[in-house]
Amino acid sequence: MRIGLGYDVHKLVENRPLIIGGVTIPHDKGLLGHSDADVLVHAIMDALLGAAALGDIGKHFPDSDKNFKNISSLLLLSKVKDLINKEGYKIVNIDCTIIAQKPKMLYHINAMKKNICKCLKLDNNMLNIKATTEEGLGFTGKEEGISANAICLLD
């Protein structure tokens, strides 16, 4: 059994779509990044790679590589799944938290779960996604960015 912890953060900017968990969420700002900047999926990828002792997403998908420009993070997550499976690991469960003042994530969590479970070929009960705010504190509370944490168990 191996445990992995992942974290990601991206700045909110104008003229970008807000994609979290593979879901495009209506909002006046989106996340800045080389790929689609999906903080939730990035945190999950780092947790999985960490548990398998395979480094991090920057090692496998560097932002200096033009092939990853605006790429769907779900596509990268599928590649991470293949990497950990190649090492003989399977996912037992994943637990995640999205930290955002706005927009409210509650209405989008089921769609996020569906996307990620489909990508990783997980049963619905193997993935938990929740969201919280920081009560107006810090960069997420001031709506300057959105972050996500993920923890996973591999067998």
Curated annotation (Swiss-Prot):
Catalytic activity from the UniProt record: 4-CDP-2-C-methyl-D-erythritol 2-phosphate = 2-C-methyl-D-erythritol 2,4-cyclic diphosphate + CMP
Class of the enzyme per the UniProt entry, highest EC level: lyase
Thylakoid found in the keyword field: no
S-S pairs: none
Cofactor: a divalent metal cation
Cofactor-binding details, from the entry: Binds 1 divalent metal cation per subunit.
Binding of 4-CDP-2-C-methyl-D-erythritol 2-phosphate, residues: 8-10, 34-35, 56-58, 61-65, 100-106, 132-135, 139, 142
EC number: 4.6.1.12
Source domain of life: Bacteria
A family per Pfam: YgbB
UniProt site positions, description: Transition state stabilizer: 34, 133
InterPro entries (alphabetical): MECDP_synthase, MECDP_synthase_CS, MECDP_synthase_sf
Keywords: Isoprene biosynthesis, Lyase, Metal-binding
Gene Ontology terms describing biological process: isopentenyl diphosphate biosynthetic process, methylerythritol 4-phosphate pathway; terpenoid biosynthetic process
GO molecular function terms attached to this record: 2-C-methyl-D-erythritol 2,4-cyclodiphosphate synthase activity; metal ion binding
Binding residue positions for a divalent metal cation: 8, 10, 42
PROSITE patterns according to UniProt: ISPF
Pathway: Isoprenoid biosynthesis; isopentenyl diphosphate biosynthesis via DXP pathway; isopentenyl diphosphate from 1-deoxy-D-xylulose 5-phosphate: step 4/6
Family note: Belongs to the IspF family.
Assembly description: Homotrimer.
Record function comment: Involved in the biosynthesis of isopentenyl diphosphate (IPP) and dimethylallyl diphosphate (DMAPP), two major building blocks of isoprenoid compounds. Catalyzes the conversion of 4-diphosphocytidyl-2-C-methyl-D-erythritol 2-phosphate (CDP-ME2P) to 2-C-methyl-D-erythritol 2,4-cyclodiphosphate (ME-CPP) with a corresponding release of cytidine 5-monophosphate (CMP).
Name the UniProt record assigns to this protein: 2-C-methyl-D-erythritol 2,4-cyclodiphosphate synthase
